[in-house]
Design a protein with these regions (language model features):
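A short, well-structured catalytic beta-strand-centered motif of the EAL phosphodiesterase domain
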Residues: 1-13, 32, 67, 130-132, ...
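Regulatory and interdomain segments flanking nucleotide-handling catalytic cores
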Residues: 1-17, 35, 39, 43, ...
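A short, internal acetyl-CoA/4′-phosphopantetheine-binding micro-motif in the GNAT/acyltransferase core
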Residues: 14-20, 137-143
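Residues at alpha-helix caps and immediate loop-helix transition turns in enzyme cores, especially N-
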Residues: 7, 61-63, 94-95, 120, ...
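Catalytic core of bacterial c-di-GMP phosphodiesterases, primarily the EAL and HD-GYP domains
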Residues: 1-2, 18-95, 170
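The catalytic core of metal-dependent phosphodiesterases that act on cyclic dinucleotides
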Residues: 48, 67-142, 154-191
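Conserved acetyl-CoA-binding loop-helix of GNAT-fold acetyltransferases
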Residues: 24-27, 148-154
Length: 191
């Protein structure tokens, strides 16, 4: 109410705890499909990502909502990527079912902020994922001689070995972009 920016790390858990997460997810789906439809229909090479909460991943109730919102827009399901953090995959069986239904409908699925959560590598290997998004904390360490910078080549190699698309988050410098490009990272996003 005071006009200040509030981080999703703060309001998403509040929305989940208060039972408002479904309404928030529905609002985001409506906004994305309405606001981006003309752009996505005009250029089929573009995509937009919708971040999902752990509750969304467990219930899967957002999929029919998304498909109703896409009906008649001309937007292809492959242009809507679905993302969840490692926390969203903690209930692996429910998440796996949701991911399989999303992928069978044509959506690409990404694990967001990879490396900052608690998932095991065996969980990562077992999930039907299309993309891995490297957290910005690793990207910002590129060229900084930080201990974190030694981790990023291993994340990239692992994602390539799993045949996942790779997205680097928080790319802000030419040096970071060049390093990531030369390492085979396909997509970058700024902060």
């Amino acid at each position: 109410p005071d006009g200040e920016w509030v981080s999703p790390e703060m309001f998403i858990p509040l929305a989940e705890h208060s039972g408002q997460i479904d309404a928030l997810t529905d609002l985001m789906i409506a906004a994305v499909t309405h606001d981006m439809a003309a752009l996505l229909e005009a250029d089929r090479s573009l995509h937009v990502a919708i971040n999902l909460s752990a509750g969304d991943m467990q219930s899967g109730r957002f999929l029919p909502v998304l498909h109703r919102a896409l009906a008649g827009t001309g937007v292809q399901p492959s242009q809507i990527w679905l993302e969840a953090t490692e926390r969203g995959f903690m209930h692996a069986e429910q998440a796996r079912d949701t991911l399989l239904r999303a992928r069978s409908a044509g959506h690409l699925v990404a694990i967001d902020d990879f490396g900052t959560g608690y998932s095991s590598l065996s969980l990562l290997e077992s999930l039907p994922l299309d993309a891995l998004k490297i957290d910005k904390s690793f990207v910002s360490a590129i060229g900084q001689n930080a201990a974190t910078s030694v981790v990023i080549p291993h994340i990239i190699n692992m994602a390539q070995g799993l045949q996942l698309h790779i997205v680097a988050e928080g790319v802000e410098t030419g040096e970071q972009a060049q390093y990531l490009r030369s390492a085979g990272v396909e997509f970058a996003q700024g902060w």
